[in-house]
Amino acid sequence: MVNVRQPRDVAQILLSVLFLAIMIVACLWIVQPFILGFAWAGTVVIATWPVLLRLQKIMFGRRSLAVLVMTLLLVMVFIIPIALLVNSIVDGSGPLIKAISSGDMTLPDLAWLNTIPVIGAKLYAGWHNLLDMGGTAIMAKVRPYIGTTTTWFVGQAAHIGRFMVHCALMLLFSALLYWRGEQVAQGIRHFATRLAGVRGDAAVLLAAQAIRAVALGVVVTALVQAVLGGIGLAVSGVPYATLLTVLMILSCLVQLGPLPVLIPAIIWLYWTGDTTWGTVLLVWSGVVGTLDNVIRPMLIRMGADLPLILILSGVIGGLIAFGMIGLFIGPVLLAVSWRLFAAWVEEVPPPTDQPEEILEELGEIEKPNK
């Protein structure tokens, strides 16, 4: 019998693999500037896809109008706040650095301490004793560090330009994905099925659920609390309310809540003697700080029940790895990986035997081998 099987050509196989590797690396190199923007757009589109479908029904089934409205909403949510933040930094950094470097910053008198019952007079006297013992010297020692820190933060504002480019790419890709979302989703599911069969398709669907869960459970809650807290800061007359609102968003994303920003603002209002607005902001901060306990259970019932350590690690790690965009992409990547890992583990039933029985069986197996 003649063997018609062709011998393996090792050189051909190696060259084919090398060619494919070069093509993949070249393609990734070309699309590298767009990867973060596209990933961000994909996250936004998956999370807001139900909203697009509802808008399309309201607008008599016209996808173009729904896409236009969603794009305008994204501009209001992302572009306008960033523009306000940049404007606030530019307007406020100059006078702040000038006051620090020139030595014009002095410690306040804190006359409102006298209004505190029982202990107010002692606090006021103690504060003035501190000033008499070297309050100016304290400011002289602290001032260089304050100036260096402020200059560093202002220097980081240069990264806003790159972030704005990613925002523009996100808007462009989001509009395209809104327009052809069904075709893109079908293509991704087809590719996943080609890779891993039914498991690949299930992995894509689980990933979409995880993305929507992160958007609901983390981002929505953070935005609601931060916006309400920012409104309270603006109404109370706290300076740099826009910048503090952005800091509140970061604080809420890492699951610390808005209070780490609101409490110093309250202290500042009492410090400057504006006790009325300080009390108003104190009450409002209590409402905003506990709002998480109302929103979170509602979102958990909608499928946003994710481990706290997962969200915290995703936000911090994403911020370090990808910058400001990582605040949104980091938790999504970890949540998708977590859901896929959990689904893979659940394919096998959990052990039902007692640990003692397993150890006894293991000991009986090892005895004959001795």
Swiss-Prot record:
Its main location: membrane. GO terms for cellular component: plasma membrane. The chain crosses the membrane at residues 18-38, 40-60, 66-86, 107-127, 157-177, 214-234, 249-269, 275-295, 309-329. It is found in: Cell inner membrane. Residues 39, 87-106, 178-213, 270-274, 330-370 are cytoplasmic. Keywords: Cell inner membrane, Cell membrane, Membrane, Transmembrane, Transmembrane helix, Transport. It comes from the Bacteria. Residues 1-17, 61-65, 128-156, 235-248, 296-308 are periplasmic. It is a multi-pass membrane protein. The keyword Transmembrane helix applies. InterPro entries: AI-2E-like. Disulfide bonds: none annotated. Pfam families: AI-2E_transport. Belongs to the autoinducer-2 exporter (AI-2E) (TC 2.A.86) family. PANTHER family: TRANSMEMBRANE PROTEIN, TRANSPORT PROTEIN YDIK-RELATED. This is Putative transport protein YdiK. The gene is ydiK.
